[in-house]
UniProtKB/Swiss-Prot annotation:
UniProt pathway annotation: Membrane lipid metabolism; glycerophospholipid metabolism
Species of provenance: Ehrlichia ruminantium (strain Welgevonden)
Residues the entry annotates as binding NADPH: 10-11, 31, 108, 140, 257, 281, 283
Coiled-coil spans in chain: none
Domain of life, per lineage: Bacteria
PANTHER family: GLYCEROL-3-PHOSPHATE DEHYDROGENASE, GLYCEROL-3-PHOSPHATE DEHYDROGENASE [NAD(+)] 2, CHLOROPLASTIC
Active site: 191
GO biological process annotation, one example: glycerol-3-phosphate catabolic process
Official protein name in the record: Glycerol-3-phosphate dehydrogenase [NAD(P)+]
HAMAP family: NAD_Glyc3P_dehydrog
Entry GO CC: cytosol
GO terms assigned for molecular function: glycerol-3-phosphate dehydrogenase [NAD(P)+] activity; NAD binding
Catalysed reactions, as listed in the record: sn-glycerol 3-phosphate + NAD(+) = dihydroxyacetone phosphate + NADH + H(+); sn-glycerol 3-phosphate + NADP(+) = dihydroxyacetone phosphate + NADPH + H(+)
């Protein structure tokens, strides 16, 4: 069995390690030719996960043609949401090589230009490929260390989804199926912004009670947007790994880049400097603008999310933002 992963960052590399350890051949694509060559030569991704060994059945390449073929069990995309349209277009141009191959998307967030979630972007472009979302509480380093996580595969085709789970689920990647593909992505997008808020509260030393308050209020904001977008709610999604589980993980540890980013803000670091240094790594900073635009379009209020937006982009004071978050 062969699987291709597009995105040779921390998460893509960790998924490759977890799959290859269970006998799956993995093609790992990344833009940086020097890095992919180094992976093949030294069996380490020095750029992103330098301390972890990559098994020999992982082949890295910067040539996208090498990873798009009709004998892939699936193609997994582990790239930032704002780059997803470009990559999907490249796949679409190679449809003769991978038509009907399932696409599993790990991207989290909302596209700035269209206000679309990752699955909506992919479905717009890749009309012949079954689209799934793979999401849940899953730090790359823990996956690379073969520690277990529970994640969700969401998509419309239940039979195909469950078949994929049988093939790729293992003692590290414990995967369950959901049909609620939009609900899963709402939780994945909002949790990063809520984690920034939790980091700010922790950085200001306002206590664990206040952090718990933000998590609780944040869960309500996920539910609010969920109902507005989906016109219904699936409790299995809301209290499952992709919403509640990912929210708890992202909001309660400094290993979360979004929480750590908020922590530095709470400690008084310059916000613009932090954004400049972390824009590509902290998903919440790129998600908050389109999220607020989507909330306005759907006529819903998300107090925590608008507070973070105003803090990052409208120059309100930190104390005012904290007051709004906790009010």
């Amino acid at each position: 069995m062969k699987i291709s992963i597009l995105g040779a960052g921390s998460f893509g590399t960790a998924i490759a390690i977890a799959l290859s350890a269970h006998g799956i051949s993995v093609n790992l694509w990344g833009r940086d030719h020097r890095n992919t060559t180094h992976i093949n030569t030294y069996r380490k991704n020095l750029k992103y996960l330098p301390t972890y060994h990559l098994p020999d059945n992982i082949y890295a390449t910067s040539n996208i043609d090498e990873v798009l073929s009709d004998n892939n069990t699936c193609i997994i995309l582990t790239i930032p949401t704002q780059q997803l349209r470009t990559i999907c277009t490249q796949i679409q141009h190679k449809q003769h090589m991978c038509k009907n191959t399932p696409i599993l998307i790990c991207s989290k967030g909302i596209e700035i230009t269209s206000l679309k979630f990752p699955s909506e972007i992919a479905e717009e472009i890749l009309q012949y490929n079954p689209i799934f979302i793979l999401s849940g509480p899953s730090f790359a380093k823990e996956i690379a260390e073969h520690l277990p996580c529970s994640i969700v595969l969401a998509g419309d085709n239940k039979e195909l989804g469950e078949s994929l789970i049988e093939k790729i689920s293992n003692d590290v990647l414990k995967i369950i199926y959901h049909q609620d593909i939009i609900g899963v992505q709402i939780g994945a997008a909002l949790k990063n912004i809520i984690a920034i808020a939790c980091g700010i509260i922790a950085g200001k030393n306002l206590g664990n009670n206040a952090v718990a308050t933000v998590i609780t209020k944040g869960m309500n904001e996920i539910k609010t947007l969920y109902i507005a977008k989906n016109h219904s709610i699936d409790l299995h999604t809301l209290i499952g790994p992709s919403c509640l589980g990912d929210l708890i993980l992202t909001c309660t540890t400094e290993h979360s880049r979004n929480m750590a980013f908020g922590l530095e803000i709470g400690k008084g670091r310059n916000i613009n400097t932090l954004i400049d240094h972390n824009l590509k790594l902290v998903e919440g900073t790129s998600t908050v603008k389109p999220l607020i635009s989507l909330a306005k379009k759907l006529n819903v209020e998300l107090p925590i999310c608008i507070s973070i937006y105003n803090l990052l982009h409208e120059n309100i004071s930190l104390d005012k933002a904290i007051s709004n978050i906790l009010s």
